[in-house]
Amino acid sequence: MTSPSLRVLPCLAIAFAYTIPRAAHAADPVASISFVEMAEQAPAARDADPTAAGISAVGVKAAAAAAARPTDILVLFDTSASQMGDFRRSGIDALSALLDAARPGDRYALAAIDVECVPLGKDFGPARGPEMTRALQSLAARTPLGSTDLVRGLLKAAELFAPGDRPRVVVYIGDGPGVDGVEPAEFAAALDTLRARRIAVTSLGIGPQINWPLLAALGHATGGMLVIPGENHEAKAAGTRTGSLAVQAVIWPEDSALGAAGKAALRMLPSRLPPLRSDRESILLIEGPVKDAMLSFAVDADGARKPVQLTLPAPVVSPDNAFLGELARNARETDGIFLPILGREGLSLTRAAMVGEAATLALLSRQAEAAGSHASAVRLAEASLRRDPDNRVAGIVRTVAQKRAVDAPPPPAPAFDVPQGNGELAELEAMRRVRGQQLERETAVRIRDARQLLTTDPERARSELKEAQDRVRLDPDLDATARTTLLAQLEARI
């Protein structure tokens, strides 16, 4: 998918390759079902994972935009080590534009986040008031250090809001957690806290390696959004857009339940209906037959609790949605809290990412088959086909490897018991090695290009090398030895 210059997940009007019915299928004065789509599995994918059939994506939207009320906005500005140089300047530009576009009735506060969340002011106030001026001065004095503990920061941020009925919003500016990621139990607890206190989190992705899947999952679970500036450094435009999106009205459904027609069994991922907005879908993955199923929940409307019931229509079947089976398969263990399906574009980006994984796995399967490891080749090819049934390389390799595995003589018994590893973990480790090797090659090319550039534009050469250095330092796929070697080479050139 080609990246737009300013990506908003999912507000840009983008025409996707799959068919999306434009009319709402089931409506209520509060919410409506905007689309229901199902994965049409190719035989190759069905053979690779027979349990993945019957996965539907369902889009739910608030029926109409409610009037946005005066809001309290806490800006979490990432001051970790990744936010240096141009990234720091872009973040400051975006923050300045966000504050300049603030509405008169909104109140703002600023906090820094790295290994912990540190408030930079005493209270919420006008976007360009004296309290914010002092907070911005404190921010300018902070040196980017450490990593980003986003979960801990969000829990601290939730405590900074005063009691009352004003809408609460967190705007995070940064690239998200680094190589360590977040623990599922801790992330789930943070989401529970944010939801209980009705705090929507909108993120502005700025940094060398934006963890967009996690930031998208955070926005999906809390009724927020995600904006990622393009390569043209449009930080100010992104800041203005982020500020506008962050204060849009959010509906907080409670007691959500999914009832199947007849005796069919259904499972919803995530298991709780996310908050609803009128400017994007809240997307659910549903396992099982969805036609005539009933999605019910309650909302606060006009000072009273209002029940809502939406009947799901028959899904539109599309082969482009075959990735939904593997997406749901990967999400079951964590109850769907990490699903990055932030509206339709989030769904499309997720598909593109999984197709990329399928290509990597297909390459690994071909390498395994060339080395005579037929069983590994079959396993890797099937993992590729679960993500992208149209991957021809994986389909051919699987067919060839299965035939050769049958024809090959049985291997000799090992002299000692060999423990069997987890198949999925082996796949991920193999993918990690390939991506690490690719980064090593890319770094070597960048060093060579910088050497050629040195005689004509030494400042640009140094900047290119420092960008490569940041990427090597933060990339999760490099092993420690390769990382140390590459960093030493880059440091010597710099």
Q: PLM ranges: what are they?
A:
Residues 29-46, 54-57, 64-74, 98, ...:
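An acidic, Ser/Thr-enriched
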Residues 76-87, 121-125, 138-146, 176-178, ...:
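Second-shell loop/turn segments in exported
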Residues 66-126, 150-158, 166-174, 202-206, ...:
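Von Willebrand factor
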Residues 55-57, 88, 92-99, 129-136, ...:
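Extracytoplasmic/secreted envelope proteins and their assembly/folding machinery
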Residues 8-22:
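Bacterial N-terminal signal peptides
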Residues 351, 355-494:
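Alpha-helical, heptad-rich or low-complexity scaffold/stalk segments
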Residues 176-229, 237-240:
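VWA/integrin I-like adhesion module and closely mimicked acidic/polar interface patches used
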Residues 28-36, 107-138, 155-161, 180-185, ...:
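Short beta-strand-loop
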